[in-house]
A protein has these predicted regions:
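N-terminal hydrophobic or amphipathic helices and topogenic motifs
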Residues: 1-22
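A short, structured surface patch at a secondary-structure boundary
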Residues: 21-76, 80-87, 187, 215
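Short, structured coil segments at secondary-structure junctions
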Residues: 39, 57-58, 99-100, 182, ...
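His/Asp/Glu-enriched short active-site or ligand-binding loop at hydrolase and phosphoryl-transfer sites
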Residues: 47, 171-195, 215, 240-241
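Short helices/loops that flank or line small-molecule/ion binding pockets
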Residues: 70-77, 99, 198-207
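A ligand-binding cleft/hinge motif common to bilobed small-molecule-binding domains
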Residues: 87-98, 210-227
Length: 281
């Protein structure tokens, strides 16, 4: 292929004269995106938890949330390392670059970032046609979801990322963009941190119309909220769960979670046809 270049989400330019052949992905969603872009066979390393697609489970592990195994990374001789802007430590990225590795840092904050990242990987991996097709399919599905809920009455939502302590996300998180697609708004959008601990008192003050719990268990955490019967969401029975695996991975599968969230939130509107103002989608 001819020489190509991309600009990562730090603003750093990466140039290549040939497709990357040995790739390490430092986050589960990045591993998945390489497969989506049509280059799963180029992966030589992953971090713990990178379990989708199933083929990824056979890859060598080079670390986890606690840190990276730099000796293992050096031994695998990657010609491209994929890092997650808010999920990998800056010091680790800088150390990899000092070793001479090309590091692409991606930081998805909006639904639109997912197809952009797929296309970017297609450029670097020489799988442009397949990556473009995957990106187009994702955009088409995301657009249909937006149109389905455009103009619906707005619903305020608390997303529970963790129960003890109670952790939620702010308006810059991709989960907030999913909520916007559903015609909803994040009740804690104004938090200064991407993910932060909030108190029960803060939730009582915000009094969201619905609570969405990220969990693989259908009834995870819902019983705990029954201690707060004055919450609108508790009174209305508007406490829902969504697969944490789907909603927290910035890949095409996030739309599976989005479709469930949107349908759950729409059920609140069906119960309260006169509720809130239209969503500004």
């Amino acid at each position: 292929m001819a020489a190509v270049e991309v600009i990562d989400d730090r603003g750093v330019v990466l140039r290549r004269d040939s497709p990357a052949q040995r790739v390490i992905a430092l986050a589960p969603h990045l591993t998945e995106l390489v497969f989506v872009a049509g280059a799963g066979n180029r992966l030589v390393g992953k971090v713990r938890g990178s379990d989708f697609p199933p083929e990824a489970q056979a890859l060598a592990e080079v670390g986890d949330a606690a840190g990276l195994d730099f000796e293992r990374i050096l031994a695998l001789r990657p010609d491209l390392v994929l890092a997650w802007g808010s999920g990998n430590r800056i010091a680790d990225v800088e150390r990899l670059e000092r070793f001479g590795f090309a590091v692409l840092v991606l930081e998805p904050r909006r639904i639109e970032d997912i197809p952009r990242h797929i296309r970017m990987l297609g450029v670097l991996l020489g799988t442009g046609a397949r990556a473009q097709a995957a990106a187009r399919a994702f955009v088409s599905r995301a657009d249909r979801l937006r149109e389905r809920y455009r103009g619906k009455p707005a619903v305020s939502v608390l997303f529970e990322a963790w129960h003890q302590p109670l952790i939620t996300v702010n308006g810059e998180h991709l989960i907030s963009d999913v909520l916007r697609r559903c015609g909803a708004r994040n009740a804690f959008a104004a938090l200064p941190q991407l993910a932060a601990v909030v108190s029960p008192e803060q939730v009582l003050s915000a009094d969201p119309d619905a609570i969405i719990i990220g969990s693989e268990a259908e009834d995870a955490g819902s019983e705990g909220w029954q201690r707060y019967p004055n919450l609108k969401s508790v009174r209305a029975g508007a406490i829902f769960t969504v697969s944490a695996d789907l909603i927290t991975r910035q890949t095409p599968r996030v739309l599976d979670a989005a479709e469930k969230i949107c349908a759950d939130l729409d059920s609140i509107r069906d119960r309260n046809p006169t509720s809130p103002r239209p969503s500004p989608l």
